[in-house]
Design a protein with these regions (language model features):
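Structured mid-to-C-terminal alpha-helical surface segments
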Residues: 1-53, 65-69, 75, 81-284
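Glycine-rich beta-strand-to-loop/alpha-helix junction loops that act as flexible
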Residues: 55-59
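Betabetaalpha-Me/HNH-type nuclease active-site subdomain
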Residues: 62
Length: 285
């Protein structure tokens, strides 16, 4: 897909326009989907930290596994915490709640410093070499663990942003994962135009994402009344509903060990006073 990224803009526009007509979607969505896939291919095959990342979240459910139909436009990534200087098991060491909170804050600060001072500069250099001044990369003003990529765009749609958000965190679990094949919509319709129509991406299994979303909604069920409900959480209900229509539900429900690992991880690294994670089990969730 790198060859499509570097062809004249008018030729890409024609490709996206024709794909949109065939698929009954807006040109802007076809265009952004291409750049999401291009970024995934870059991150996992050409980026300096290609071996230190894993793909997770809603976009993985749609692009890697075809489990949901909503257009997921952000890329959620796990960064190996060894990149930040931690030993492979160091974050799991026993600590008091107070010391664990201090560790978690320090880990997040290290991640933010790495993204701002090292990762961003490397990505800018690499993408500029491919795309020239047509791409802009910067840290989100409101979230220092998010890198925004303003990709070359020819189409607009009020329902989507003309940028890709790379949401990158080190306090996330790597397993279980598999290598998944990811293909942009344009390559599904016009694969012969692509020298590389798809890309292999190390991706968290949907069964873990299932339990991640179940535990999110379990926590929200106990949210204290004086604490405002977070925005954009309807997606978790939708994603979980769609996964429950597939074998992912049965696979996840049969894997109590995976549920325990998800709960233990959240309780250690994302402790929440009202979440009642101790009550989570198949009989209570």
């Amino acid at each position: 897909m790198r060859n499509i990224a570097t062809i004249p803009a008018r030729d890409r526009e024609a490709l996206f326009r024709n794909t949109a007509a065939k698929m009954g979607m807006s040109e802007a969505i076809i265009e952004k989907d291409f750049w999401v896939c291009y970024m995934l291919d870059y991150l996992f095959h050409r980026c300096a930290w290609k071996d230190n990342l894993a793909f997770k979240g809603g976009t993985s459910l749609s692009k890697a596994y075809g489990l949901i139909e909503r257009f997921s436009e952000d890329i959620d990534l796990i960064l190996d915490w060894r990149v930040l200087g931690y030993g492979i098991n160091e974050p799991w060491e026993q600590r008091s709640n107070t010391k664990q909170d201090i560790f978690n804050k320090e880990a997040n600060t290290r991640a933010e410093d790495f993204l701002r001072d090292t990762f961003l500069h490397s990505v800018v250099a690499d993408l500029t070499a491919d795309l020239g001044d047509n791409v802009k990369c910067f840290i989100d003003d409101n979230d220092p663990q998010t890198v925004k990529i303003a990709y070359p765009n020819s189409f607009s749609d009020m329902s989507i942003l003309q940028e890709i958000r790379l949401e990158i965190g080190a306090l996330a679990a790597w397993t279980p994962v598999k290598v998944a094949d990811i293909t942009p919509y344009a390559a599904q319709e016009y694969g012969r135009l692509f020298k590389q129509p798809s890309t292999d991406i190390l991706t968290v299994l949907p069964e873990r994402t299932f339990w991640e979303k179940v535990t999110i909604l379990h926590r929200e069920a106990f949210r204290e009344e004086d604490r405002p409900f977070p925005t954009r959480y309807s997606r978790h209900y939708y994603d979980l509903y769609r996964m429950m229509q597939t074998e992912v539900k049965d696979n996840a429900l049969a894997d109590n060990d995976l549920l325990t690992k998800v709960v233990d991880f959240k309780d250690k690294f994302y402790r929440c006073p009202w979440a009642r994670y101790d009550q989570i089990g198949r009989a209570h969730v």
